[in-house]
Curated annotation (Swiss-Prot):
This is Uncharacterized MFS-type transporter YcaD. It comes from Escherichia coli O6:K15:H31 (strain 536 / UPEC). Its main location: membrane. SUPFAM superfamilies: MFS general substrate transporter (SSF103473). Belongs to the major facilitator superfamily. YcaD (TC 2.A.1.26) family. Coiled coil: none annotated. InterPro entries: MFS, MFS_dom, MFS_trans_sf, MFS_YcaD, MFS_YcaD-like.
Length: 382
């Protein structure tokens, strides 16, 4: 059976359009707020509202999928995000945008949970790594193209909102031509997110998603600041961030394939070790291009491999709940990691960015090494 079936390809095609819209808005909303002369704390609160919506959307989506299936859940998530986009143009103000970004955050998280869950339910333990790698490649390519669009088109609010909303609705079209089956049966009791977080045999996967959130959140949010403080120009900062993200894109497919072939545990150990090496290279002021490249290739691929690891440990009907738990773990890591790291950087040194990344990666490596010797046979999903 082919890994990339027709439903999978159409699902990823729709996701690409949605990711473009998400990337454009996430870049421009803080700039629009600044143009309206809102204070820094107001910009921060609006951003927090979006991420709070992410958490709420993550918690709700499992119930929605169980009630109406993958296709309708995907349509609903897209409509919610489109409403969050269009609503920004109805009234420009702090409280209004606070509410609409919360709505957009819910829709965005629902899209992620639906797509990730559909891919995991479509795959088996033999090809799930490649499916999630394809998902991450589409996500990063969409993010990259979104940034490119921002640099090429008008960024005025009322110029952007119509085509971004249209792009979001266009993301629904591919799914109209296929049906993604929800193979969870009603014979099983509903599985809670809490029970998935407590599942002992999946703990390395859950912890891996938290670590991935800390690493990626810190790199995305604080690397530009680190480079700026080193005297790097804005144009050069864009180049180095492109190197980082490009490495993540290029690393997805080969690492996903290696994880399917040689096992997730071995690949996770190597990835985390390489993240530590990349962090040390950045601290030692070595050649920045290779250091950033290996950091991006290893760091940006942690999430899908850790996710695939955790999903091997559960029954098929538990996959959606497990995916919610993993996305929730990643979100918590991506919120707490940059906040704590930024505080350390402000009070001590900018080098704490890479010391923090290396430290949490080393802790995770110790967890992975403790699992040496005997690894339970994964649950087979056919």
């Amino acid at each position: 059976m082919s890994t990339y079936t027709r439903p999978v390809m159409l699902l990823l095609s729709g996701l690409l359009l949605l990711t473009l819209a998400i990337a454009v808005l996430n870049t421009l909303v803080p700039l629009w707020l600044a143009q309206e002369h809102m204070s820094t704390w107001q910009v921060g609160v609006v951003s927090s509202s979006y991420f709070t919506g992410n958490l709420v959307g993550t918690l709700l989506t499992g119930y929605v999928i169980k009630r109406i299936g993958f296709n309708r859940s995907y349509y609903l998530a897209s409509f919610i995000f489109a409403a969050g986009c269009a609503g920004l143009g109805l009234m420009i103000g702090f409280w209004s945008w606070l509410a609409w970004r919360f709505v957009a955050g819910i829709g965005c998280a629902m899209i992620w949970v639906v797509v990730e869950s559909a891919l995991m339910c479509s795959g088996t333990s033999r090809n799930r790594g490649r499916l999630l790698a394809a998902y991450m490649m589409v996500y990063y390519v969409g993010t990259f193209l979104g940034q490119l669009l921002v640099s090429k088109v008008s960024t005025e609010l009322m110029s952007v909102l119509p085509w971004v909303t249209g792009l979001t609705l266009a993301g629904i079209l591919p799914l109209l031509f296929t049906r993604v089956l929800n193979q969870q049966t009603e014979n099983h009791d509903s599985t809670s997110i809490t029970s998935m977080l407590k599942l002992r045999q999946a703990r390395l996967g859950v912890n891996g998603c938290i670590i991935s959130g800390i690493v990626l959140g810190s790199l995305y949010g604080l690397m530009p600041l680190y480079l700026n403080h080193k005297g790097v120009s804005n144009a050069s900062i864009g180049f180095w961030m492109a190197v980082l993200v490009s490495a993540g894109i290029l690393g997805q497919w080969p690492i996903g394939r290696l994880a399917d072939k040689f096992g997730r545990l071995l690949v996770l150990r190597v990835q985390v070790f390489v993240v530590i090496l990349g962090s040390i290279a950045m601290l030692s002021q070595a050649a920045m291009a290779p250091a950033l490249f290996i950091l991006g290739a290893a760091g940006f691929t942690l999430y899908p491999v850790a996710m695939a690891w955790a999903c091997e440990k559960v029954e098929h009907h538990q996959l959606v709940a497990m995916n919610q738990a993993l996305l929730l773990s990643y979100t918590v890591g991506s919120l707490l990691g940059p906040s704590f790291t930024a505080m350390l950087m402000q009070n001590f040194s900018d080098n704490l960015l890479f010391i923090m990344i290396a430290s949490v990666s080393f802790i995770y490596l110790l967890m992975l090494l403790r699992n040496a010797g005997h690894t339970p046979k994964p649950v087979a999903h056919v």
